[in-house]
Amino acid sequence: MIGTEKVTALKAKHQSKSSTGLSWFERIGYGFGDMSYNIIFQFVNAYLLFYYTDVGGIQPAVIATLFLVVRVLDAIFDPIMGLILDKTNTRWGKARPYLLWVAFPFALFTFLCFTTPHFGETGNMVYAYVTYILLGMSFSMQTIPVNSLTGRMTNSVEERTVLTTTRMILVYIGILLSISCATPLATAIGGEDQAFGFQMTALIYAAVSIVLNLFSFFTVRERIQPKKRKKQGIKKTLSVLFKNKPLLMLISSFLAFAIGFNIKLSTMVYYFTYNVNHKEFVFMGTVLFFGAALISNLFIPFFSEKWGRKQVMIITAALSLISYAGLHFTPYSSIPLIFIWLFASGFFTTPLNTLAWGMVADCVDYAEWKTGIRADGVVISSMSFINKLGVALAGSFSAIYLGIAGYVANTDQTVASLNAIKNMNALIPGFFILLSIILIAFYPLTEKRYKHIISELEQRSAR
């Protein structure tokens, strides 16, 4: 057995590197890395469906197939990217260099996705598939390394919560500005030419993402260096996913959240355009929803330390159900009440997202403790895969539901299509949030158990 003094010294040394070693400058720099991704990712999620139907004139059924095929292919790339990340070794670390390498391709493919060529109907569809697939691959090459950095910068539960919360506050600021400014920017730049307006808006966002990525690259550091072990085969590395009950419960819950959240996000513009009949309120609705998310994230570290992260997820998500039910029964003419429900849903729903991305780093340590294999990339990529699968299912569901309901762009909508849009902003997201609550209730990794796992890992490393 290792001596008590040696374990104590090892813990003290480790704490000095993880808990006290992160300055606010570095936390903010890390947040900028994820902010750069989400400015683009959420812009695409919120507006690409609308861009294709109302600007490109593509039928919803065609878009449904495009979204499902491209996003599933994109999601399949995530585990591959995870394996690539696990085999990456540079003088800058494993994950950090991707902030530099991917910054420019990521920006380029964003611009190309919102560029409509004149290749004819078939040529334009091929172009849409190719550019969207390339954008999705660059998404993976950006987000998987960024998310794995949490576990490489610190293994303190408290520090990870602060780090993830700081990151998510910046993410929600980015999303807030990205989504709320998109329509005004596109209108100001393009006027009646929406295609040009959205293209230039995408170019502006792409340029901002490059700056944020580079800032993040130059500010973050990888401190946690796991003990070197012999290389594992791909099959054995992937096996850590299926032996990891905390991860399986976390990603199942997150899938339900991602479907519900993205159904609402991608149809909010329809809700204000056709149901409320005030397209100009898209800006205010977005500000309230993501502004509320930003505010709620300020309280997450305090309540997570007091009650535990799983309990905070369950309580806040349960409270969010009231807002979805309230929105469903609110008349379209009651604008102030609609805004109140939007604020409440943003405030109480988004902690699910924030805490889940922090907890996945714990699942990496759990896998190492249980199997002896540390596979940051593979574990993190499973979360990214689920996120993209949720986006794919949400986008396809929304497009199919609009088609079935008889939606026709740029006309007065039927009662059936108005009800479909309302359902996708209220009852349907509420159902998936309820499912997410039920699944996360079975997440077995408590803060106390996690600290015990870290203690055992430290003792193993010292032997």
Swiss-Prot record:
Membrane topology listed for this record: Multi-pass membrane protein
Key words of the record: Cell membrane, Membrane, Sugar transport, Symport, Transmembrane, Transmembrane helix, Transport
Transmembrane segments: 28-48, 50-70, 99-119, 126-146, 169-189, 200-220, 246-266, 283-303, 312-332, 335-355, 389-409, 426-446
GO cellular component: plasma membrane
Highest taxon listed in the record's lineage: Bacteria
Function recorded in the entry: Probably involved in glucitol uptake.
Descriptive protein name: Probable glucitol transport protein GutA
Organism: Bacillus subtilis (strain 168)
